[in-house]
Amino acid sequence: MIKFFPLFFFITSSALFSQGGTISGVVQDEKGEPLAGANVILKNTVLGAATDDQGNYIIRKVPVGKPYQLSAMYIGHRTVTRDIHLQEGEIFTADFIMKQSLIDLDEIIVSASFSKRKKRAQASPVTVISEDELRRLPIRSVDDILLGKVPGGYANLPHRPGQNNSAFTLRGGTSGSGRPLGDVKIYVDGVELLGFDVQAYPGIADFIDPSDIEKIEVLRGPMGSTLHGSNAQSGIIHIFTKRGSSSRKTVMRMKIARKNTVAPILNDDVIGHEVSFSLSGRSTSDISYNLGANRTVDEEVMPSNGKNIELLKLHGALNARIGSAKIDIKTFQSWGKQGFISNLFHLLKYQEERGWTDAPDHWDDPVSDGSIEYYKPGFSLNFTQNFNPNWYQTLIIGNDTRQSLYRKFGSDGGESYLKHDWNRTTMNYFWHLKKKFPNLVELDVTAGVQRTQSSNVRLSGTVDEAKDQYYYDDFEDASLVDQSNSNMGYYAEAVLGYQERMFLTFGERMEENEYFGRDYGRHISPRLGLSYIWELGNLIGKARAAWGSGGINPPQAMQALPSESSYNINIGNPDLRPERQSGYEVGGDFYIGDNFFLEVTYFDQLFLDGIQNDPSIDDPGTLKQEYWYINFGEIINKGWEFAVKTRFGPLDINATYSILDSRWGQDSIRQNDPDYEGFFDEGVRRNDVPTSTANLSLAYSLPGISSKNRKGGSLVIDLNYTGEKKGRDWLKYYDGFYKPDVEPFSYYSKDVLVYYKPYVTVRLRGNYWFTNNLAAYLDIRNLTEHEDISRSITQPALGRQMIIGLDLEF
């Protein structure tokens, strides 16, 4: 089927327009400020434009002789529509004044079904983080975006600058063990990023300059992510980067920042620096571009061999319109380097405080000499062709690669190395068709095919590693690991709408997975959804319900196959089964006037055959920890999610609150074993999952200095609450290993269970434009300097982190 795509793609049904007419104007808010990036479209056509930095737009070559409806749309504002009629050669001026509004039912969402669809038709809750919000929230990683912004999102605090938070989950995730993002699939401009399935960490801090992000869509839960297939059980994050400027004027931006971070382990403060530059513009009416670079240097917050964390990121975008087709080509390149750290050195403090006289001698060994370097290139091509206003096709081709080199030098001058090459290539083709019927019924159909091919090649030399015939090819002084997986998915979704009020969704994905040479067969994932819009006075409500049985999560190579590192040994488990899930959710969205929004969702999800790290087989007397991965029975996640937005003059209030009841279901293996008593009993709460999370964000808009400089700024305070959670008392656990008068505890001993108290972290952010070209900003994270050791005492959180910087725009 794929071989016909090139021929199919360059068939065009668009006719050559006459000179036609031109529509131009300016889009402003209620204060007369220009709205950059607003979309102005002619309804029921493929014609439209986005406003430039001054709010100006222009639409050329508009066929004349018939009436049109011209609509202006901007996130956070009411859509404005007016009727127009053009004559041949006429230049029609249409200005818009847009009123702020939290009513976002007509906002276009892409993440749920790949194609563009209004939020009113979505049966699952979607969180959209706009460019305006991102400017208030300097981000360093994926979870920095989600934490506090998305109901049901939770992560432990990070322990190194710019690093992903540990074990991020949405709605409790699946196993939550060893999965950096808890089965959240991440896309950048439609291209799937490397993830846990190929042993890679998909943090956007590695390659994306935060100032290059246009908006982010977050779709939580397996009911909404069904069409995306395997490894998306907890949800979808779709990041959209910026296109070129809508204006012929070239816009240059520069950011300079200095970071000061409290390092509790070093008992000192460490310094970091960041510089970024971007350039955007438009060479012709149909071609625009965007280029940028970002450079960061951070001192280590852990005992190290003296090397800093260095990162250089470049990005570029070229956007073109050719007749009825749009082409977006984007690339990102990043280079990074850092030294080695010790995760054990600071345990000497506990050794003294708790009398660990049997502690190993190697805890205070000097950190080895060497470094870790990586190069991460990426590429995406989006081709969309409109056959008519209600029918278009899209082809997305992309690649995400990460190459790393681990180099270690011995005291004798010898060198060992580990070279890792991760690669993922994505191709996604779909078409989207809307058909209106005379009886006010509309049919909206999307169908497509998605192919993902991933690989993980590891070449190591003079490194002591265990060998396995399924895992390694041996050479004289090196070993080669070649793992690959592929996913082929066919998907379709139909939405039947009535009077723009009621929407019924039917969707299904059929996919085939092959991981490291093993065929996991064919899997079918259906979904159903219903949404209904109603009005009562100034109250608008949207009732919604969804059910889905999402894609499987096949075991990863690092779980099923043996491996060995400097610290631990995975004995492997080739009999692992894929994870599976299904669930439903019901809820509603409520809008009171333009300034109040409430979202309520109840969900019930069942996970089967979850895969989890099990170190119970470890012999404490050996230097390296031994572990393997096993399947357990059921996880039942139930809960409530609430989100509130409101506005009082210059004050915006955003709040989320989530109640999560995550418990073990039936497990025929471990529930009959007394060694696991208290951990996996049916109905027992899971470890490391908080009972509740909440966020309160207060953002105050500051007025501009004068009538010539109206940009102003904002002051934001964030309060993040993490509720009680069950976990291990790690200090007591290690007492059993290293304290001679304490009997050792097994890893799953109920005697080491403890309930960690709730805590609150505070973040303060602010920015202000002193001129139209110069702004200063401040970001203070973890003001309370909270340290969380609930998951591990070898990697505690950072202390307070303060960032001060300047923004320049010309």
Give residue spans per PLM region.
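Short acidic/polar hinge/loop motifs at secondary-structure boundaries
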Residues: 57-60, 191-220
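Extracytoplasmic beta-strand/coil segments of soluble accessory domains associated
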Residues: 147-191, 215, 226-242
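Conserved C-terminal beta-signal and adjacent last beta-strands/turns
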Residues: 280, 294, 319, 540-541, ...
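Outer-membrane beta-barrel transmembrane domain signature of Gram-negative proteins
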Residues: 262-276, 363-382, 416-503, 547, ...
